[in-house]
């Protein structure tokens, strides 16, 4: 999946602020699709991921 405004497609797996999860495209509060982290049905907000230092 590729999110609008993203240079790269969402990865299948990623480090979600230290928690393992699946990166998926999701609708943010801005009304834009962003890469977000999903762990089962639990979503970690994209802005929290963006604030994580890689």
Swiss-Prot record:
Tissues expressing this chain: Expressed by the venom gland.
Main location group: secreted
This protein's record includes keyword Disulfide bond: yes
Alphabetized UniProt keyword annotations: Disulfide bond, Ion channel impairing toxin, Knottin, Neurotoxin, Secreted, Toxin, Voltage-gated sodium channel impairing toxin
Keyword ATP-binding: no
Molecular function GO terms recorded: sodium channel regulator activity; toxin activity
Cellular localisation: Secreted
Annotated GO CC locations: extracellular region
Disulfide bridges in this chain: 3-17, 10-23, 14-52, 16-37, 25-35
Function in brief: Blocks voltage-gated sodium channels (Nav). Causes immediate spastic paralysis and death in mice within 1 minute of injection at dose levels of 1.5 ug per mouse.
Family the entry assigns: Belongs to the neurotoxin 03 (Tx2) family. 04 subfamily.
Domain remark from Swiss-Prot or TrEMBL: The presence of a 'disulfide through disulfide knot' structurally defines this protein as a knottin.
Designated name of the protein: U7-ctenitoxin-Pk1a
Organism the protein comes from: Phoneutria keyserlingi
């Amino acid at each position: 999946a590729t999110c609008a405004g993203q240079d790269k497609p969402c990865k299948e797996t990623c480090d979600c602020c230290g928690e393992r999860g699946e990166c998926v495209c999701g609708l943010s509060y801005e009304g834009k699709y962003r890469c977000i982290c999903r762990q089962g049905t639990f979503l970690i907000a994209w802005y929290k991921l963006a604030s994580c230092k890689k």
